């Protein structure tokens, strides 16, 4: 297992109107996962190639965010992120990141990745799993949390609100299908794609939050308490994405929703995003 801790001071890049920026922490933890892969694999830098020499990247398959209140963090607050990573399969790794401030855990981010490559140069629709037989690092049993994420991801990918018995998370049993809606977005090359020319995983969270805001424009924006994201595909530059809300709950506790993220050009589902938020003062 690989372990590391890094200190921070909350500034404008780390903060949003609702406290710590979820988008920032996703990107930061994503980079820490990437760097940890190199260290765990006994490499000086995160350069990976598959068995036939193609550039390979760690693509996230599942991410879980749990918070104790992003809004508690303020400008100039000191905090640290504690990272652990283990290899749980031939090309699969699992990491957990804990944001700690003043001895209190404010957020945890759990991430599962596998290595992928393109079978066609420049075509993000040709992304497939990569084989890296020479990858270093001991393989360990996945922790219970990882197993839970794998199981929920499998159930979510193959189910919908009409087949709720296949879904284990209690939230999904309370969503109402009368709120079905869609928002379309064109990913921007300057902000939504990463240096590997792939639609960045953190952009999926951003699209879902934009769809929520575009629909509701709450006077007091709610604060994320839990989010689960499962990724299945990517898009090419020029493709648009549809965020289709297939179930939603709005009550005195806050708002919750399950969104399919679809590639508009062929209708393929490229992600599921399940979100819970609470009202800021509740």
Please provide the spans of the model-predicted regions.
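Hydrophobic, proline/glycine-rich low-complexity stretches
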Residues: 1-82, 88, 208, 212, ...
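Non-catalytic linker/capping segments at the edges of enzyme domains
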Residues: 1-24, 91, 116-193
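Generic structural motif
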Residues: 4, 80-83, 227, 242-245
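Binding-site signature for planar aromatic cofactors or substrates
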Residues: 9, 28, 33-50, 95-123, ...
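Generic beta-strand hydrophobic packing signal
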Residues: 63, 225-229, 273
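HotDog/MaoC-like acyl-thioester-processing domains
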Residues: 70-155, 235-237, 247-282
